[in-house]
A protein has these predicted regions:
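Bacterial Sec-dependent N-terminal signal peptides
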Residues: 1-20
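Noncatalytic scaffold domains of N-terminal-nucleophile
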Residues: 19-48, 52, 60-61, 65-234, ...
Length: 325
């Protein structure tokens, strides 16, 4: 398994973050090209951990798993233990692409009655729903879905990883204990998510004197280090069947949430076939449902295939118009 390529996609569930842009990077980023491989994520400290794993003899999946857990420390909006995602893994020797679905799932108790406090036998009229009523589906404990990230990353490691799980996660545990300097990105993510103050624990972690942690502040996450340490030893069971799950469910129930232990013990990520299309003599693979992005991507490529893009400069108005369409 020397040649291995993968793509991960993470989504958030425990804390919904506004989709509006809140970051204005002061300098443009340009494409980077490498010959022997690279690790790319939304935080350089997490990418550095991926490089560390590769230098220890790990493969791409080992590195991706380490990066996925590290992002829970460095930039939780990009990856965290409370969300879910999708992964594509390409095994060159087999010429095969694997799709892992670890999307977060709605709690078993999630229904209109429990979410909106409706009477079970009451006739539901869509006109009765006001926009502000849907805030409970965007923020807080009722907006939370059963997390799939831990299951998905560990399933990927079990199937394709090379190094022992403890070796993969040890640099992440060290990072959480030693702390990281708050980045501009993380600071802005906290600043644009004031609802984090509504929960005492998230307020304790991400705020200082009632203000978002400032840039370059040393943020340590010893509790998260303990959680990841338990996972490194006990695997999926440590998260979905142990005291970690108990604490999440208790916190949910104490805050009018919908989680039950069965949501955690019954959760499983799954391997599925990716979807694909032909684009200019290339076969493009991507994640299928429940991911909506894959279908959108392949549809866009099929539309673009009818246009001769070589006729236009890469930075021309026509090129940008076609791409944006």
């Amino acid at each position: 398994m020397k040649n291995l390529f993968l793509i991960l996609s993470f989504s958030l569930s425990l804390n919904s973050i506004s989709q509006q842009s809140y970051i204005d990077y002061v300098s443009p980023y340009h494409p980077v090209v490498g010959n022997s491989g690279m690790v790319v994520s939304q935080n350089y400290l997490s990418s550095d951990i991926g490089i560390e794993i590769l230098n220890k003899g790990g493969n791409a999946v080992d590195a991706a798993v380490a990066v996925g857990f590290s992002l829970a420390i460095t930039l939780p909006r990009a990856g965290n233990l409370g969300g879910g995602g999708f992964m594509l893994v390409y095994i060159k020797e087999k010429e095969e692409v694997y799709f892992i679905d670890y999307r977060s799932r709605s709690p078993l108790n999630a229904n209109l009655q429990n979410i909106f406090g409706l009477t079970k036998n009451k006739k539901i009229n869509p006109k009765d729903f006001r926009n502000e009523m849907f805030d409970v589906t965007r923020y807080g404990y009722k907006a939370s879905a059963t997390p799939g990230t831990v299951s998905g990353l560990l399933e990927a490691h079990a199937a394709f990883g090379k190094l022992p799980l403890k070796d993969v996660l040890q640099p992440v545990i060290n990072q959480a204990n030693e702390g990281i300097l708050v980045s501009y990105d993380l600071h802005k993510a906290i600043e644009s998510t004031p609802q984090l103050k509504n929960d005492p624990e998230s307020k304790r972690i991400y705020f200082l004197n009632d203000e978002p942690l400032p840039e370059n502040y040393l943020m340590k996450r010893p509790d998260l280090a303990k959680t990841i340490s338990k996972i490194s030893v006990g695997g999926k069971k440590a998260f979905y069947q142990g005291d970690i799950a108990d604490k999440i469910v208790d916190a949910s129930l104490n805050n009018n949430g919908l989680f039950s232990l069965e949501d955690f013990t019954s959760y499983n990520s799954k391997f599925d076939a990716p979807i694909a299309t032909s684009y200019r003599d290339n076969l493009v693979f991507t994640a299928g449902p429940p991911s909506g992005g894959g279908i959108t991507l392949l549809t866009a490529l099929n539309v673009l295939s009818y246009f001769n893009l070589e006729r236009y400069k890469s930075d021309s108005i026509t090129t940008y118009h076609l791409l944006s369409e």
